[in-house]
Amino acid sequence: MSFTDAQKFWDDRFNTEEFIFGTEPNKFLKEATLKYLSGDLNVLCVADGEGRNSVYLAKQGFKVKAFDLSPVAVEKSKKLALKNNVNIGFFVSDCDSWKWKEDCYDAIAAIFIQFADPNMRARLFKHMISSLKPGRILIIQGYTPKQVEHKTGGPGKIENLYTKSMMIELLGGLKILELTEHEGELREGNHHIGMSALMDVVAIKPI
């Protein structure tokens, strides 16, 4: 799928008054934030959608930037941030076009970014790892291949889903603090709802 096609796909999906993934933060992101993040941190939310996760992080007092390739989603994110009285740097960008800077962020959140095919995924993980400051945290949640049985969200493409061996390879050079496969109930708007096959990941960049 080309950038133009992908942008149209997500614009069409987000083009509704409803927040399709809800306005509450991802449960695992919230848990990991409370466990690992504190202080005056610069945080990046990758492919942030309608802003539920970036708004939560900003409400914790962090300095947050977030990007998504859908202008429709970014406009909804801005409205959600305004409603919650937080300031966030929102940008329209895809993962390849984002201006990645080395050793820039104290934390990066990548929640359900499985639109990325294997080639894009490899580039994206390389960028995220490079952009983390040493000693800082990468937080990821995504679907495992078993998700295709549940059909409760996700791309439905096996090659886009996470396995433990894949994640260990992608995170080469980082210390993995959490790497857990599990099944659990998701209730995130009307598009992530029901029993789901999940992978939770937290990794730290060595000093």
Name each model feature, range by range.
Residues 1-38:
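Conserved class I S-adenosyl-L-methionine
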Residues 70-72:
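Conserved SAM/SAH-binding beta-strand->alpha-helix loop
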Residues 77-78:
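Conserved SAM-binding loop
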Residues 84-96:
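Conserved SAM-binding strand-loop segment of SAM-dependent methyltransferases
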Residues 98-107:
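A short acidic, Gly/Pro-enriched loop at the edge of an enzyme's catalytic core
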Residues 115-128:
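A short, conserved alpha-helix within the catalytic core of class I
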Residues 135-142:
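Conserved beta-strand signature within the Rossmann-like core of class I S-adenosyl-L-methionine
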Residues 159-180, 200:
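Short alpha-helix
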